[in-house]
Every structure is written in structure tokens, then in C-alpha cells.
Amino acid sequence: PRVLALFAQHYPQIRLKVQVNSTRMIAKNIINREVDLAVVGGEIPDKFRKNLLIEHFVEDEFSLIIPKSHPFASKKQITKEDLYHLNFITLNSNSTIRKFIDNILSQNQIETKQLKIIMQLNSIEGIKTAVSLGLGAAFVSSSAIEKEIELKTIEIVKIEKIRITRTLSIISNPECYKSKAFEFF
């Protein structure tokens, strides 16, 4: 969001249209020339890769956020075992982000089916609000919680020996004309 805001401030004459969708759907829209450019974080299906120009953009780290009132808030780091004592608020189980996080946790010998998921929501904003109200903990992109960290409504806690990151990529159709707006971005 911050990158888009900066771009819009620098180039107010360029019309931005922001869509949130699955990486698969966005890739299809790029190939079908319905969208010029997209920033995606999910895995791009192999069948679409040959028809796309893919440029790695930035590393996106996910943070474990907890309410300020939680006993772990005074710790800067917790163990993997501590995760089993948290109530989690997550995206729904079909979410690409949720699957990605579950996969990383599983690779680190964390039984995701044993985690206490008390709430599944459809938006990051809803998750951040629920955490700030003290309802539970969640994994969210660090770039999505800058305001909450500044306002001190939540705490970030590191997990010993675990770091969850993904690469955000810019994708476009190599066969399409690249406008000046595209080049500016």
C-alpha cells in the first residue's frame, strides 16, 4: 500500500486501479490483457509463466502480531512450542497467504492442525482489528502493520529460528505495449 500511495503522489495524472485477487486470477488477467501490471505474492502457476514477464520486486516478511495486553507482549522472542498456547485469527483456509504460512510452519515442524484457530476472516484489516482488540494472534505482512506499530496498538513477537518471507513480483504481459505510466512504475 505504501508503494502505491507514493506512486500516486508522484504521478497524480496516472489513474491507478487496485484489485485484490488470487495470483492465478491476476496472472490470467495479465495474459488476457485485462490488466497491464500487477504485484503478486503467490506462486505463479507454471502454465502461466511462459506468457508472463516476471520481475522480483521485494522480499515481504510476515510477522506474528499479538495484543499489547498478552503476556508474550513483553517478550521479543518466543519458542515454537509457545505457538500452541496462542489463539489464532487467520485468513480463511482457501487463502493463498494462509496456505503459504501453514506450509512454512509445517516445514519448521509446527503441527498447524494443532494450533488453536478461533476465528477465520476474509481481510487483513479485520484480522488486525481483532488482534488489537485482544482477541488473538495472527501472522500478517509486516508492510500491512506499519500504522498499527506506529500507533502501538499491537506487538510483534519473533519466533525462535523461524522467519516467514515471500518474494513479491511484478508481472506483466511481454507482448503488450508498455505505456509511460508502466515505465514510471
Report each predicted region and the residues it spans.
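Central regulatory/effector-binding core of bacterial HTH transcription factors
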Residues: 1-45
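Short beta-strand elements of ligand-binding domains
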Residues: 37-42, 66-67, 91
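Flexible hinge/capping segments at coil-to-helix
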Residues: 51-62, 66-89
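Hydrophobic hinge/microswitch elements
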Residues: 22-35, 41, 97-154
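Short beta-strand->loop
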Residues: 52-62, 150-164
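Alpha-helical segments flanking ligand/cofactor-binding loops in enzyme cores
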Residues: 27-28, 55, 81, 128-129, ...
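Secondary-structure junction motif
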Residues: 72-73, 87-109, 178-180
